[in-house]
Amino acid sequence: MRPVVFSLILLTVSHFTASEEPTWQTVEEVLAVVGSTPILYSDITLATLVHLVEPEPMESLEDYRSRLLGARIRLEVEFRDLEDTGLLYRLDLETGTYRDALISRAGGEEVLGTSLRHEGLVWPDVDELVLRVAAVDAFVEQRLRPRISVTKEEIEAAYQELLVNEIAVSDEPVPPLSAVRDDLHTLLVERKLNEEIESWLERAEEHQEVMRFGR
């Protein structure tokens, strides 16, 4: 089935009589709605310009834009949750750092500026995206990461599972636990953090109605 794409429509009302057909012009495609916030085609265009997510090797443009839409919906759900709960206003946001990073990913300020003009976008559109990225990352780092703890037993279990058992089938020597303890700790922290992020997203989605129309 062909995906349905909703559009915001501009009706041209001048210079037609009652017997004439009105002229309709598509102003902007709405690809999804999070709560009452539309995700527009131009939002995905901007996400493409700044590489909000990196394309996969051999990935088609259609598939890439679909992943971008999914990532943009997720970002909006998380941001709206922070806003609705008031947490947004209690976070230390480093918007300048994230703005610089997105501009760099887009090829620099001059390149991005030219691309924005070509696509009918403006710098405040970039700032809105920056705010969302900065807020979500701030919540992850300032609120979720401090909750994570890794026990000695968990590190030892990971050592057994990821190194001893895997290397046992080869002739390679197993490195001592002391040599890989820090790496295993980091791995377990990031694994637990990802689980916390997914749990947060699930809770946020319970309070935000999401409609995805296509692409």
Annotated model-derived regions:
Residues 1-3:
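Positively charged n-region of N-terminal signal peptides that target proteins for export
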Residues 5-17:
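Hydrophobic h-region of N-terminal signal peptides that target proteins for export
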Residues 21-26, 30-33, 39, 61-215:
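Peptidyl-prolyl cis-trans isomerase
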Residues 47-63:
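Short, conserved catalytic-motif segment at the N-terminal edge
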